[in-house]
Swiss-Prot record:
UniProt organism field: Polaromonas sp. (strain JS666 / ATCC BAA-500)
Major subcellular location class: cytoplasm
Pfam families documented for this protein: cobW
Keyword vocabulary terms for this entry: Chaperone, Cytoplasm, GTP-binding, Nickel insertion, Nucleotide-binding
Name of the encoding gene: ureG
Ranges in coiled-coil conformation: none
Quaternary data: Homodimer. UreD, UreF and UreG form a complex that acts as a GTP-hydrolysis-dependent molecular chaperone, activating the urease apoprotein by helping to assemble the nickel containing metallocenter of UreC. The UreE protein probably delivers the nickel.
Subcellular location: Cytoplasm
Function noted in UniProt: Facilitates the functional incorporation of the urease nickel metallocenter. This process requires GTP hydrolysis, probably effectuated by UreG.
InterPro entries in UniProt: CobW/HypB/UreG_nucleotide-bd, P-loop_NTPase, UreG
Protein name in the entry: Urease accessory protein UreG
Assigned protein family: Belongs to the SIMIBI class G3E GTPase family. UreG subfamily.
A biological process term (GO) from this entry: urea catabolic process
Length: 218
């Protein structure tokens, strides 16, 4: 299905596809849940979740009430999760097509990848905007390790900042390393430091999606 020729779509612009990636346990599903809850009264949303052998993230989002159950589709990727978002994204592209049959006027399609390493990136065929999430508990050194998720994502999210004192992480060092790794000849690529337990940084993530994705409510 062409995103520019969706049957029964009444909106002029195609849906915005937002890919959310990051290592296991970084907070991808929590971020997706909070984005859906905060944005669903303003925008028409659907979500695709990726797990290797289960549909656990789909279940978690459904139980939490992030969206109506029929607006969340779980994909079992098998094998390496990055394959399903990069080398062969067909399983996710098919999932998007199926969701758009039922919800042709969707404004945003969120695609959450399975937990993966710092080298994972989304195929441009699958995602218009990419958000890469790490968590402070994984170590202060993570931003300076680099990798496409850290250096090339449209938005880089450093999550669980509240855990810094407990794991000996210096947020100032992480911020400085992030600035160094995400500075390009065209300027600094955006990043946000978040504590999703208290909604800290959530508004900035939403503003990024709305601005860069050129969203129009209604």
């Amino acid at each position: 299905m062409s995103l520019h020729h969706i049957a029964n779509r009444t909106k002029k612009l195609p849906p915005l596809r937002v890919g959310i990636g990051g290592p296991v346990g970084s907070g991808k599903t929590t971020l997706l849940e909070m984005l859906c809850k905060a944005m669903k009264n303003k925008y028409d949303l659907v979500a695709i979740t990726n797990d290797i052998y289960t549909k656990e993230d789909q279940r978690l989002l459904t139980v939490s009430g992030a969206l109506a159950a029929e607006r969340i589709m779980g994909v079992e990727t098998g094998g390496c999760p990055h394959t399903a978002i990069r080398e062969d994204a067909s399983i996710n592209l098919e999932a998007i097509d199926r969701m758009l049959v039922d919800f042709p006027d969707a404004d945003v399609v969120f695609v959450e990848s399975g937990g993966d390493n710092l080298a994972a990136t989304f195929s441009p065929e699958l995602s218009d905007l990419t958000i890469y999430v790490i968590d402070v508990a994984a170590g202060e050194k993570i931003p300076r390790k680099g990798g496409p998720g850290i250096t090339k994502s449209d938005l880089f999210v450093i999550n669980k900042t509240d855990l810094a004192p407990y794991v000996g992480a210096d947020l100032g060092v992480m911020e400085a390393d992030t600035i160094r790794m995400r500075t390009t000849p065209k300027g600094l690529k955006p990043f946000v430091m978040t504590n999703l337990k208290t909604n800290t940084g959530l508004a900035e993530v939403i503003a990024f999606i709305e601005t860069k994705g050129m969203l129009q409510a209604g």
